[in-house]
């Protein structure tokens, strides 16, 4: 029995040290050395302080900011610990009700906007955490944001164009706008009706 138990226990402890301690430390060290920003969470800094991550969306509800995709992570929007397959099936009546409710909320926030609502403003991404919207979704919101902030519409549209990321190598992915980065750039603008 000792002849069988001893090698099994030695192997157990050796593999535990290798896979539970040595390997994670080596991978973490390599990540910190080779990709320090990504290893730290791909943080977006403002005045040296983290304001978010480039990988996870945030819940903007103020009409003076651009809004991201709906989060499907339950009562706490953009909760990374609740991420997962989140969209309802296309035949589920609850999906239709949710989309109608989101369209109504968008129309109420900008009653003069008769344009079709872009689909990414009313449906959640697969993870429910997507930080990007389409350029069409940003353009749809531009008039509301300009009006609330007292900015010229053309200035807001220029900002959207400036913050639009193109497909990688010109062919992989879609054009997209990072909502947090767009809102930070928007916050840096001075409204026309601002004092001083």
Curated annotation (Swiss-Prot):
Entry keyword set: ATP-binding, Cell inner membrane, Cell membrane, Ion transport, Membrane, Nucleotide-binding, Potassium, Potassium transport, Transmembrane, Transmembrane helix, Transport
UniProt keyword annotation of Lipid biosynthesis present: no
Keyword Cell wall biogenesis/degradation annotated: no
Localization of this protein: Cell inner membrane
Gene Ontology MF: a single term: ATP binding
Membrane-crossing segments per the record: 7-27
InterPro entries reported for this sequence: KdpC
Pfam hit, one: KdpC
Assembly information from the UniProt record: The system is composed of three essential subunits: KdpA, KdpB and KdpC.
Function: Part of the high-affinity ATP-driven potassium transport (or Kdp) system, which catalyzes the hydrolysis of ATP coupled with the electrogenic transport of potassium into the cytoplasm. This subunit acts as a catalytic chaperone that increases the ATP-binding affinity of the ATP-hydrolyzing subunit KdpB by the formation of a transient KdpB/KdpC/ATP ternary complex.
Protein name: Potassium-transporting ATPase KdpC subunit
UniProt source species: Polaromonas naphthalenivorans (strain CJ2)
Source organism phylogeny: Bacteria, Pseudomonadati, Pseudomonadota, Betaproteobacteria, Burkholderiales
Recorded name of the encoding gene: kdpC
């Amino acid at each position: 029995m000792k002849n069988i138990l001893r090698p099994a226990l030695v192997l157990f402890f050796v593999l535990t040290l290798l896979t539970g301690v040595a390997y994670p430390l080596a991978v973490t060290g390599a990540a910190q050395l080779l990709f320090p920003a990504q290893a730290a969470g791909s943080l977006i800094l403002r005045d040296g302080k983290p304001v978010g991550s480039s990988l996870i969306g945030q819940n903007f509800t103020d009409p003076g900011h651009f809004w991201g995709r709906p989060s499907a992570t339950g009562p706490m929007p953009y909760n990374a610990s609740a991420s997962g397959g989140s969209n309802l099936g296309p035949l589920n009546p609850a999906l239709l009700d949710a989309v109608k409710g989101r369209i109504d909320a968008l129309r109420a926030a900008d009653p003069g906007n008769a344009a079709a609502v872009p689909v990414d403003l009313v449906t959640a991404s697969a993870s429910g955490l997507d930080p990007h919207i389409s350029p069409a979704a940003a353009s749809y919101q531009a008039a509301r944001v300009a009006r609330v902030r007292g900015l010229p519409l053309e200035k807001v549209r220029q900002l959207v164009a400036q913050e639009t990321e193109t497909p990688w190598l010109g062919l992989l992915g879609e054009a997209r706008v990072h909502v947090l980065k767009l809102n930070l750039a928007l916050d840096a603008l001075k409204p026309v009706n601002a004092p001083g």
